[in-house]
């Protein structure tokens, strides 16, 4: 789900929603991989990010939106190659969501969120083998 980002609150809502969706998606993706560790590590990264964002919601006095019961993966996942494609697309979407939100985020979390954007770009490259914007980041 994509939220129209127009201010600080909507930026945070969009990022949290992206985390919820990614956590769900990586559970499905991991089930189709012969070695699910990479997907489970990515899921753990999104869980940590979700928790950081929930703390930011609390500190800023905003109510955090709840997670949905299920999410669309955006592409069918039926085997290992399609799971890897879904993971790459998921991380590319993460780059887009974080890039869109950065302008509106509070200054105290911008650096942290920029680093997460870069981590999404690196994971996208890891899944697809195709370099995208920001793939130079460690």
Please tell me what each predicted stretch does.
Residues 1-138:
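All-alpha RGS (Regulator of G-protein Signaling) helical domain and cognate RGS-like helical scaffolds
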């Amino acid at each position: 789900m994509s939220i129209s980002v127009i201010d600080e609150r909507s930026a945070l809502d969009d990022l949290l929603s992206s985390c919820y969706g990614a956590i769900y998606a990586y559970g499905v993706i991991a089930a189709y991989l012969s070695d699910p560790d990479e997907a489970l590590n990515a899921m753990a990264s999104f869980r940590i990010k979700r928790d950081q964002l929930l703390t930011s919601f609390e500190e800023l006095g905003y109510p955090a939106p709840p997670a949905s019961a299920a999410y669309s993966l955006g592409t069918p996942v039926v085997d290992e190659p399609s799971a890897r494609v879904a993971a790459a697309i998921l991380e590319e979407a993460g780059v887009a969501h974080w890039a869109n939100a950065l302008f509106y985020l509070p200054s105290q979390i911008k650096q942290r969120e920029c680093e997460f954007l870069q981590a999404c770009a690196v994971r996208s490259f890891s899944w697809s083998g195709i370099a995208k914007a920001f793939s130079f980041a460690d």
